[in-house]
Amino acid sequence: MSKSRTPSRVRNTEPVTFETVRRLALALPGVEEGKSWGTPAFRVGKKFLARLREDGDLVVRVEFAAREVLMGAAPETFHITDHYRDYPAMLVRLSKVDPDDLRDLLEEAWRRNASKKLLAEFEEGRDR
């Protein structure tokens, strides 16, 4: 989700589950599923993108400025705890997030961490 885009105001009716997260994350080139802190996580190369927390929230890598915008626009969906205050990450309540917003968040996290080769492959695939 770009800094200028705020979360969707009209919620998509598709319920977001971890299977939704998995499908969206693994659709991005080079993303692999593994474990982080004992829960499912996604990385591109060795770089963290997202992980499921024990409480069911999703931790997503996000720039600080974008995090502030999103938390201000939809605090019921996007939040942090003190633990994440100094990290470029944000918590996402899967029960509240719109699937399109989640897809955008995961794609932006991926774009910031993917290799130039993977980025080129992704863009080439979009042009087809």
What are these regions (language model features)?
Residues M1-R128:
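Charge-dense, helix-prone N-terminal extensions
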